[in-house]
């Protein structure tokens, strides 16, 4: 699933390619992707509307119009591809936005899990799913103290599963939680309630740093992720994720993989000790 760095990379690409364009028509080939209304009113609402800019909240893309947002979640395999002119859709293209200049934006999704929803600007941030999100990790008001307060309600849960909650630490997914905990030297099975403020401070600093570096590298291309402009490169810097059996870059111990909350989890058994 694309995490914050991948979604931010997609956002930046879309901002360059579709911001300022006016939609002339929309074709929806998989109606279940459209949430909150039927396909017909969704299509009608977007006709002749101009994309002012493309924003992001956590892992959600927000196409900004005059009165509303188009809130898009890529889920597992969602991708956007801009084209300078109309082209024939492939079998995995489920939504096509046609612009008044003749260009198109195709939404492609092999798994068909992605969603699109129109939300009024006045209420979008105060109702789910956007209302449930923590502030952006790069927001200076998101401090280690805020993270510590958030973790209080997860004190009996492993820190790995706690950090996957977008109301705890926005933007982290399976890849970047593993990398964050390795950088912070915290075992993924450590209960959130067993962490010291120093532990939480290291997790906070590591999480923000990992996400920032991943954004700079265009995200991580693991399996099928690509942005509209190509593949990410942060996978070349991953210390533990996907490195089962490889030597730890700090101590040389073989990286191990376990299941935590049903998610494959990578860690160094020497550098990351369980706090009881």
Curated annotation (Swiss-Prot):
What this protein is reported to do is described as: Involved in base excision repair of DNA damaged by oxidation or by mutagenic agents. Acts as a DNA glycosylase that recognizes and removes damaged bases. Has a preference for oxidized purines, such as 7,8-dihydro-8-oxoguanine (8-oxoG). Has AP (apurinic/apyrimidinic) lyase activity and introduces nicks in the DNA strand. Cleaves the DNA backbone by beta-delta elimination to generate a single-strand break at the site of the removed base with both 3'- and 5'-phosphates.
Q: Which GO terms describe its biological process?
A: base-excision repair
Q: Which UniProt keywords apply?
A: DNA damage, DNA repair, DNA-binding, Glycosidase, Hydrolase, Lyase, Metal-binding, Multifunctional enzyme, Zinc, Zinc-finger
Fetch the PANTHER family from UniProt: FORMAMIDOPYRIMIDINE-DNA GLYCOSYLASE
What gene codes for this chain?
mutM
Which Gene Ontology molecular function entries are recorded, alphabetically?
8-oxo-7,8-dihydroguanine DNA N-glycosylase activity; class I DNA-(apurinic or apyrimidinic site) endonuclease activity; damaged DNA binding; zinc ion binding
- The UniProt entry annotates the active site at 2 (schiff-base intermediate with dna), 3 (proton donor), 59 (proton donor), 263 (proton donor)
Show the InterPro entries listed in the entry: DNA_glyclase/AP_lyase_DNA-bd (IPR015886), DNA_glyclase_Znf_dom_DNA_BS (IPR015887), Formamido-pyr_DNA_Glyclase (IPR020629), FPG_cat (IPR012319), MutM-like_N-ter (IPR035937), Ribosomal_uS13-like_H2TH (IPR010979), Znf_DNA_glyclase/AP_lyase (IPR000214), Znf_FPG/IleRS (IPR010663)
**Entry EC number(s):** 3.2.2.23, 4.2.99.18
Q: In the record's cofactor note, how is the cofactor described as bound?
A: Binds 1 zinc ion per subunit.
Span of zinc fingers (FPG-type): 239-273
Q: Which cofactor does it need?
A: Zn(2+)
Superkingdom of the organism of origin: Bacteria
Name of the molecule in the record:
Formamidopyrimidine-DNA glycosylase
Please list the reactions this protein catalyses.
Hydrolysis of DNA containing ring-opened 7-methylguanine residues, releasing 2,6-diamino-4-hydroxy-5-(N-methyl)formamidopyrimidine; 2'-deoxyribonucleotide-(2'-deoxyribose 5'-phosphate)-2'-deoxyribonucleotide-DNA = a 3'-end 2'-deoxyribonucleotide-(2,3-dehydro-2,3-deoxyribose 5'-phosphate)-DNA + a 5'-end 5'-phospho-2'-deoxyribonucleoside-DNA + H(+)
Q: Which family does it belong to?
A: Belongs to the FPG family.
Q: Which residues bind DNA?
A: 92, 111, 155
| Signal peptide interval | none
The record's Gene3D superfamilies line, in alphabetical order, gives: 1.10.8.50, MutM-like, N-terminal
Q: Which organism is it from?
A: Exiguobacterium sibiricum (strain DSM 17290 / CCUG 55495 / CIP 109462 / JCM 13490 / 255-15)
Q: How does it assemble?
A: Monomer.
């Amino acid at each position: 699933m694309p995490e914050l760095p991948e979604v931010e990379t997609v956002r930046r690409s879309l901002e360059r390619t579709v911001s300022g364009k006016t939609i002339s028509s929309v074709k929806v080939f998989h109606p279940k992707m459209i949430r909150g209304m039927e396909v017909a009113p969704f299509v009608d609402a977007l006709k002749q509307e101009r994309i002012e800019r493309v924003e992001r909240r956590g892992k959600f893309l927000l196409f900004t119009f005059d009165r509303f947002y188009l809130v898009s979640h890529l889920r597992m395999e969602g991708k956007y591809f801009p084209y300078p002119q109309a082209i024939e859709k492939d079998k995995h293209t489920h939504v096509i936005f046609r612009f008044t200049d003749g260009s198109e934006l195709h939404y492609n999704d092999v798994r068909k899990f992605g969603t699109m929803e129109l939300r009024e600007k006045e209420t979008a941030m105060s109702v789910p799913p956007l209302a449930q999100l923590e502030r952006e990790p790069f927001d200076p008001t998101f401090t280690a103290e805020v993270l510590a307060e958030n973790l209080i309600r997860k004190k009996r849960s492993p820190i790995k599963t706690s950090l996957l909650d977008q109301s705890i630490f926005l933007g982290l997914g399976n890849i970047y939680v593993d990398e964050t905990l390795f950088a912070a030297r915290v075992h993924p099975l450590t209960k959130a309630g067993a962490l010291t403020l120093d532990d939480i401070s290291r997790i906070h600093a590591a999480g923000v740093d990992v996400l920032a570096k991943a954004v700079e590298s265009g995200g991580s291309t693991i399996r099928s992720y690509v942005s509209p402009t190509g593949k990410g490169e942060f996978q070349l810097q991953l210390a533990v994720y996907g490195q089962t059996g490889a030597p730890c870059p700090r101590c040389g111990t073989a990286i191990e993989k376990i299941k935590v909350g049903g998610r494959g989890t990578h860690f160094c058994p020497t550098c990351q000790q369980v706090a009881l």
